[in-house]
Amino acid sequence: MSLLVTRAGWGNSPAKEWLDYLWCFRHILEMSGATVKPVSWITSSYKDFREFPDPVQDAMGYALYQAQIGLKHGSAKPLKGFGGAGVLEIVADHVGDTFRAVYTVKFATAVYVLHAFQKKSKSGIKTPTEDLELIRRRLKAAEADYKIQLEKGKAS
C-alpha cells in the first residue's frame, strides 16, 4: 500500500511511467512462465563491455536480456563461420564508432558472452581473424564451463 501512496505523489513523472512499465513487464513475464537464464561473461568480456559508452551498454544490455528470456533482438545476427544461430553478434554504432558483443545461446540454461570489442575498420564489415580465433577459444571455454555447471547441478 505504501508503494501506491508514494507512486501517487509522483504524478506523471518519467520515474512513475518507468515503474509502471517494469511492473507490467514483470507481471507478463511471470504469467508466461518464462525463465530468465543467467549470463556468464567469459574472461575479459565483462570488463570490455563496461568500457563501452553508456548508450551502447544500454542497447546491448537489452538485447542480452532478450536472449536471457529466449527471444532474439532485432539487432542480433548469427556470426558467420560458427554454423547457424548458436553464436550471435550484436552491433551498435555510436558517434562514428562501431561496437560488437558476441554471445552464445546454444546452452539450455545459460547465455555466455564470449567477446565484446570496438571494431577497428581494417577490412570493412568483416570481423578480423584475430577476433574470430578469440571467439572460438572462448566458445570452447564456455562449453567446458557449462559442462562443469551441469555436473554440479546433477550432484546437488
For each predicted feature, which ranges?
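Active-site beta-strand-loop-beta-strand hairpin of nuclease catalytic cores
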Residues: V105-V113
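Hydrophobic/aromatic beta-strand elements that line small-molecule binding cavities or substrate pockets
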Residues: A101-Y103
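Basic, Lys/Arg-enriched alpha-helical interface segments
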Residues: S2-T98, F107-A108, K120-S156
